[in-house]
Amino acid sequence: MSGFSLADLERIVDERSKASPEQSWTAKLVAGGQPKAAKKLGEEAIEAVMAAATGDRDNLTYEAADVLYHLLVVLKIAEIPLENVMAELERRTAQSGLKEKANRQSS
């Protein structure tokens, strides 16, 4: 298994977001603002769903990587650290999924 983590990718996104938009896809997405980055995330998510639905494991792996990358760009623009998302996942896993969902619906 790779030692590469989402935290590593978050650091790369942060570094590349500071580059010139002419030299970095990440910087170009960030410069385009949240609507552009969110649209690209949606496109990649649809491609991942289609790969999953057709059983294309190789393409699903590729598209899943795109989804994770573009999600981190969207989070960067929104100034939401990955640490916050991980804390939310940790909170949710402290209880069953059904209980967590019921708690969300009642609030």
From Swiss-Prot:
One GO CC term, this protein: cytoplasm
GO aspect biological process, one term: L-histidine biosynthetic process
Residues forming coiled coils: none
GO molecular function: ATP binding; phosphoribosyl-ATP diphosphatase activity
Pathway membership, UniProt: Amino-acid biosynthesis; L-histidine biosynthesis; L-histidine from 5-phospho-alpha-D-ribose 1-diphosphate: step 2/9
Superkingdom, taxonomy of origin: Bacteria
Principal location: cytoplasm
Subcellular location: Cytoplasm
Pfam families: PRA-PH
EC number: 3.6.1.31
Reaction equation(s) it catalyzes: 1-(5-phospho-beta-D-ribosyl)-ATP + H2O = 1-(5-phospho-beta-D-ribosyl)-5'-AMP + diphosphate + H(+)
UniProt entry keywords in alphabetical sequence: Amino-acid biosynthesis, ATP-binding, Cytoplasm, Histidine biosynthesis, Hydrolase, Nucleotide-binding
Family: Belongs to the PRA-PH family.
The protein, known as: Phosphoribosyl-ATP pyrophosphatase
Native species: Rhizobium etli (strain CIAT 652)
